[in-house]
């Protein structure tokens, strides 16, 4: 009985961690919705738009 109890507790602990990660992953896209999606010569890195030199060449001033 002790081994069964330990196995159940282990399974619960292992299953609890991915649910926390899933919650963080689901929470992450929200800032992208607040900020307009990057368009044209920009691509998204985290919550920032970065200029794509390869696609559009040097930055125009």
UniProtKB/Swiss-Prot annotation:
The miscellaneous comment for this protein is: A synonymy between H.magnifica and R.crispa is controversial.
The protein's name: U-stichotoxin-Hcr1b
What keywords would UniProt list here?
A: Disulfide bond, Hydroxylation, Nematocyst, Secreted, Signal, Toxin
- Subcellular locations according to the entry: Secreted; Nematocyst
Per its UniProt entry, which superkingdom is the organism in? Eukaryota
Q: Which family does it belong to?
A: Belongs to the Hau1a/HC18/HC19 family.
Organism in which the protein naturally occurs: Radianthus crispa (Leathery sea anemone)
Q: Does the keyword Nucleotide-binding apply?
A: no
Show the propeptide residue ranges: 20-31
Q: List the disulfide bonds.
A: 38-49, 41-56
Q: What does this protein do?
A: Toxin that is lethal to crab. Does not produce the typical symptoms associated with sodium channel toxins in crabs, suggesting that it likely does not act on sodium channels.
Q: Which residues form the signal peptide?
A: 1-19
In which broad location class does this protein mainly occur, judging by the first location in its UniProt entry? secreted
Q: Does the keyword Signal apply?
A: yes
């Amino acid at each position: 009985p002790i081994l069964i109890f330990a196995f159940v507790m282990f399974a619960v602990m292992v299953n609890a961690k991915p649910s926390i990660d899933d919650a963080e992953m689901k929470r992450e896209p929200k800032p992208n919705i607040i900020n307009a999606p990057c368009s044209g010569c920009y691509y998204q890195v985290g919550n920032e738009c970065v200029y794509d030199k390869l696609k559009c060449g040097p930055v125009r001033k």
